[in-house]
Amino acid sequence: MKKQSTKRTVKRRTPRRKAAAPNREPSVIPMLSYEDGIAALEWLAKAFGFREKTRLMGPNGRLAHGEMAAGDGLIMLASLLPDYQSPKHHREVCEQARKWSRVPWIIDGVLVYVDDLDRHFKRAKAAGATILSEIEEGPPGRRYRAEDLEGHRWFFFEKEDG
């Protein structure tokens, strides 16, 4: 009797994106804190083309809850705590954070699919995004990496046809 192999081969390919059902919230929604949530809402719209959906202010005059649409996805953000340190600010005072930030990959961050990667890249660069990698091609697909105004990391992929 021939013994079956339990070894599996994993084929790498560009990540596939499945659209959310109409009128349904995405299954996963990243939630990010910002020192200045209002500035973040405006900057993310300008640099990355996200669309502001919700802006709720807290009694302290800070952003209590914000929502931005990115394609059929959603990103939530807030700036409730006055002593919160953004990744960028944290790197200024912490050697471990500075060491981590020298790694160009996205260790903690958000992956976003876009229709036109070249146009998106130019827009982000013109708005002052910190570009961590120019547009790269090859497995797992066309992509680039960037940081926003407060040092949060973003990974942008071009949508596949089909």
Walk through the language-model features, giving the residues of each:
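Vicinal oxygen chelate
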Residues: 2-32, 41-42, 48-149, 156-162
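Conserved beta-strand-loop-alpha-helix junction that forms the acyl-donor binding cleft
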Residues: 34-36
